[in-house]
Structures are given as C-alpha cells and as structure tokens.
C-alpha cells in the first residue's frame, strides 16, 4: 500500500540554514584556491557538520535528521550522494544523524547543495552549535509513551535554527525529547532534556538541564517540574541564552553547560534559568514561532519494522532499498535510532512478510545475529579525536563469540557501548556495559586499553552513570565479555567482579598487544584525542 506522501513531519529548514548552505561554496572555492589556510577552512567546515577523516583530503558530512524522522526521497538522495561523491557506506549515529563518508574537498559544496534540494542540511552538525535535536525513535508508535514528542522536537529545532546565536555558542548544545520514563532519547543526560508529562489532562514536559557525557559527565537537574507544551520554545531559548551568556569561552575543556551548573551550584543555576525566562516574558520570544505540525498519518494496525544494522553501517544500495520499501508499503517515512539502527513505521500487517523478504534480499535484518548488540563510535580508524579503534574491537568481539560458538540473546542481553575516547560518542557512561578507549604503558610499551563501565541506566526519575571497575588491555576485552555470560546474556554483575582480574597482561607480553584491533602498526597517541581530557589518554601501568 502506498500512502499519501506528506512531508509535514520532517524538519523544515529555516532560511538561515538554506542561506548558510548556499554560501558554503564560496568558502570551499577560496580554500581550493589556497586563499584560506587549513585552520581557517576547519573553522568554517566544522560548523557545517563536516569533519576531515584521518585520511587527509577526505571528509565526513553529518546530515541532520530532526527527531530521527527522514523521508524516502531524502534517503534516496543521501544514498545517491554517497555513491557519487563518497565511499558508498553510510553511518547512522547515536544522535540520529546520517553520515556520508569519504567526500573530497572539491565536492563538499555539491553535497551540501544537493542535500538542500530535498530539505536536508548538515549545518550545525558540528562545532559550537545547537546540534541535532533528538526524540524517541518510537515517538508516535510506542505504547509506553504519554504522547508523541516528535512534533515538539522538530518545532524547537526549527525555532532555534533561525537564530544566528545558535551557531555562536561556547560549545556544542544538545537537546532531547523523551516520551516516557524509559528515556530512549537520553534526555536525562542532555544539555536540555524534555520528558513528556500530562497534568490535569494537559500535555507538557518536565525539563532537565546541565546533563552531558564525556569528561566529567553528569545527569541533568530538574529546572521545570511541569511546563505546558506550548512553552517549549521559551524554555529552550532560555537555556540556550543562559549557556550563551555564562558558558566558559576561555577554556574549551570547561565550555559545556554542565560546567556552568557545576560552578554555580544547582539552585543558582536554576535562578539563572528563571532570570532568562523572565526576560523572555517581558520582551517576548524573538523570531517566528513554528507550528506544532501533525505527523504523517499512521496506518491502522500498522507495524514498525526494525532494520538492525551492524555498528550503524549501511551501504548506499541497501539504504535505497529501505527508502523504496518505506514508500511502496508504508507512508514514506523512516526513523533513525539512538542504537544506530533504522525503523520503518506504518507497514500494514498483511505485507510484513514481503517487506522482510525485500530487506533480507538486500542483506538487511540480521543485525548482531547472535552476537552482543554493540553501539560504537567511528573510533580512531577515521576519527581524528579517537584513541582506540572502537569499531574494530566490536568486530573482534563478534568474531570471538562466533569462534567460541557463543550465541547471545539480544532481547535480554545489555547493549555494549564502545567509545574510542573519553568523549562518549557511544554513550558508554550510561550503559549497563560500557567501554572507553585509552592508552597505558606496560613495561615501557604503549598498549591500547579500555576502561570498563558497569551499571549505568537511563530514567526520567533519575539516570545513573556507570561505575569504572577496571582498565583492561584491548586484546583481552573479547575474552572478558565471553567470560561474563549467564543464561545467554552478558551479566553486568559478573563483569564487575571479573574485570579487575583481566587488568594484568601476560608476563611475556605478546606483540599483538602493542597493536590495536584492525591495525598492523604499533599503537601510538600523537595527533589523537586532542579535544578534551588529555590527562586520561596515557597513564603508566602500576
């Protein structure tokens, strides 16, 4: 069944975003004419959501997917651009973006402009900006939600993106909307997190602020017990202004909103927020207030078909199949998830077998296939900030489990989250099982390690950060996880007890320990992880 194609649910780009995207060609051409230094070009392209790979001259373009809602025609365009200008491999991120990899500098403006033609942009996908505003990937579909939060996430994005100050902040600024206490959108650890609430029959939100992962992580504090839904714009703008005004612009390592909270204290932070709200009440909200648009109509008794991916990777050809399947059998809508997967909503029950068959023919639908479900950042193989090759560790874990004949029940086993450095792009610090890349010296030799986190959780009633229990050589991680199985799943309690026993390397250190997974070269740190927390990157072993 093909439903009416209605793009009202997806993010509508404000004129400012369109103008910035069109102006980017002048920047690229100036760089190619050597009229701009590498450093100057970097300052421009990062704010456009474009990052250079470790391979010099190749770039990643991060496409904003507002609230994780993307339309079939948009996905087809992304796939086309990956084929024509990139590597043909796309990546779904933990914040619901889609990344096009391997683009050369001469084609960056082409990619940005052709995204614009289908209502997509990379602007604000990086740099000191309001980043992609996320929402539960099951918004409007989930039986646990109080109400559909995605229209509010989209509208707040449209509101903030029209303001030039949203691209001139002290550091990145992340907003998330969760529809229930399960907090699938990670709102409790966002700079500003909205939780759906219903009070006296009225839709609204409980609001948290000052959360964040990475170096010195913390859970946000409640700044609004209940605010009517129509006031989301004022709340978001007030917190943005607070950050713009009080964020630490002198010290990048303390420039996130959570440091404003840490320095001020909880009650003083709330008072700063209340002051900004009062100013907005007196002066009125600047800019146009977007409509809270209705979503694409749902199919009665429709199914949401998960498309599990391995580490968020999908080929351009397979992405095209997903897009065409959603348009042919659903409503032309696809979701990106915080678990780096895709979801096709609104598939009529009677065509589900056909849809599953098409996905299977495209090599999709297997996901972890009996291995632990792993969420991983891109890691040091491509990211210039990475310390360890997180994706290669994920592959090694799967290979080890397969070689040992271990089958994991993914429905009950904790998700393993792997970040290649302290920046926590895979959100390892709120995982039941989390791993963070680092480097330590053993007998004078620099060896890749992972710090093991256990016991993290998300909740609208109070998230809990994971506890560091050990720092283990990278080569021992697959064996450690396999040793912590119970009833077909990784047991965090066992992991807490056994991880310290894996810290010690063999007495006669094998040369493989000197190399990270996926690399033939000795492990090094120069040029890596130069963003935050250098003190954690290299430590002498005891």
Outline where the language-model segments fall.
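Peripheral terminal and linker regions in Fe-S/redox and tRNA-modifying enzymes
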Residues: 1-542
